[in-house]
Amino acid sequence: MTDLKKAAQRAIELMDLTTLNDDDTDQKVIYLCHKAKTAAGNTAAICIYPRFIPIARKTLDEIGAEDIQIATVTNFPHGNDDIAIAVLETRAAVAYGADEVDVVFPYRALMEGNETIGFELVKACKEACGEVLLKVIIESGVLADPALIRRASELSIDAGADFIKTSTGKVPVNATLEAAEIMLTVISEKNTQVGFKPAGGVRDAAQAAEFLGVAERILGADWVSPRTFRFGASSLLNSLLHTLELADAPKPTQGY
């Protein structure tokens, strides 16, 4: 197997296959569940809006893919600074049966100089999650400034995040190697049990390999696993399957 095919295989096993569109329906989520059970193995998770968790759970059980985790989003996509609402949404997501919750950090508050709200929001949402995995989306493409990306990562980890994630996929700039370098460095300094999730903008096996390479250089080859590394993506899967000669070439897309 070539290095590119190896990267494609790994990226599938590390993927949160995502649909977070305004026109999502039960049928689209059922299709996503089937798609997550690929000829190259299952993706790590699917990521969907909370209201679709029950139908996703039913579908994954029916197709024998119970090991695929169900992730959902809260305080999404704008990263508002109302802690009470973020906590209510997170509690509701857990009640729906989410295995993982991706919450958006109040990044605009941080840009305005307020570090407290972000820390307190993540801390409260982690308490609401209990054993459910909490991934914190810092929206690195909007923060832009390396110092802000670093600070959002530090605050999230200090507040109890299980993962830090680059992006919502709803802004012009999503995952970049530069943001990955900063965020993975913070993980190496603070807590190597915390995971990293580049989301949006990873289009093919070559780009996936670049992100994996940064993680391995900073944290070591043994660090990367579904417990510590995920790709958030929708259009990436078809490209990876094509690399593995398991699907036709994907059509050009503007998708996440």
Swiss-Prot record:
Statement: the UniProt record of this protein carries the keyword Cytoplasm: yes
Q: Name one Pfam family in it.
A: DeoC
Q: Which GO terms describe its molecular function?
A: deoxyribose-phosphate aldolase activity
Catalytic residues identified in the record: D102 (proton donor/acceptor), K165 (schiff-base intermediate with acetaldehyde), K197 (proton donor/acceptor)
| Cystine residue pairs | none
- Identify the pathway: Carbohydrate degradation; 2-deoxy-D-ribose 1-phosphate degradation; D-glyceraldehyde 3-phosphate and acetaldehyde from 2-deoxy-alpha-D-ribose 1-phosphate: step 2/2
Q: Main location per UniProt?
A: cytoplasm
Q: What is its EC number?
A: 4.1.2.4
Q: Which keywords annotate this record?
A: Cytoplasm, Lyase, Schiff base
Alphabetical list of InterPro entries matching this protein: Aldolase_TIM, DeoC, DeoC/FbaB/LacD_aldolase, DeoC_typeII
Catalyzes what? 2-deoxy-D-ribose 5-phosphate = D-glyceraldehyde 3-phosphate + acetaldehyde
**Family per record:** Belongs to the DeoC/FbaB aldolase family. DeoC type 2 subfamily.
Q: What job does the chain carry out?
A: Catalyzes a reversible aldol reaction between acetaldehyde and D-glyceraldehyde 3-phosphate to generate 2-deoxy-D-ribose 5-phosphate.
The name this protein carries in UniProt is: Deoxyribose-phosphate aldolase
Gene symbol of the encoding locus: deoC
